[in-house]
Amino acid sequence: MNTLQKGFTLIELMIVIAIVGILAAVALPAYQDYTARAQVSEAILLAEGQKSAVTEYYLNHGIWPENNPAGVASPASDIKGKYVQSVTVANGVVTAQMKSDGVNKEIKNKKLSLWARREAGSVKWFCGQPVTRDNAGTDAVTADTTGKDKEIDTKHLPSTCRCFQIGSVKWFCGQPVTRDNAGTDAVTADTTGKDKEIDTKHLPSTCRDKSSAE
């Protein structure tokens, strides 16, 4: 009389182990990316906390704050978190730097920047890789070439913090605007023909920019 075989055979065990190995190989990198993004979000949150003070300083003085004491009244080392070493304000550029330990290895000591410029009477903020501003009286920024190794991999940044306008041309689409002269980037809403504006509901989502026309 035949007896039922119980348990796994060697081949079945090897198949199970192989499947577990494949799942681990897929899941581990995904988990590492997730933890890095979560830690970077703290840097963005702390940096964004300085935006209102920097904006207020600019609107009151007409120039960007040169440093932390001028802009946010707190030393860079005092603005920190579990994963963030410091948040520095330099000529209006807010830069957060990750810690060297206790964080995901792919973002150790890495940086990101928030910066703003005046657009049609308002201040518009951007977020992306670390940048610098040569002086407090200008809106222009340049990539921080002193530390390319400090850039955070784009995959660890949220879609709202991947600005690459430096050194490139960015186009906008929206209601009709005018530019006073060919030597400036500034545009204003075309007030001579408000009746010529297309109702927003008839425009695609990619053609509803108002930041440059208010």
From Swiss-Prot:
Name the residues of the propeptide.
1-7
Cystine pairs annotated here are 127-161
Q: Which UniProt keywords apply?
A: Cell adhesion, Disulfide bond, Fimbrium, Membrane, Methylation, Transmembrane, Transmembrane helix
Q: What is its main location?
A: other
By sequence similarity, the record places it as follows: Belongs to the N-Me-Phe pilin family.
Role according to the record = Major component of the type IV pilus (T4P) that plays a role in cellular adherence, microcolony formation, resistance to neutrophil mediated killing, twitching motility as well as transformation. Mediates the attachment and the formation of bacterial microcolonies on host epithelial cells. Mechanistically, pili retractation induces host NF-kappa-B activation in infected cells, which is temporally associated with the formation of gonococcal microcolonies.
| GO CC annotations, alphabetized | membrane; pilus
- Kindly give the PROSITE patterns that the UniProt entry links to this protein: PROKAR_NTER_METHYL
What is the protein's name according to its record?
Answer: Type IV major pilin protein PilE1
Organism this protein belongs to: Neisseria gonorrhoeae
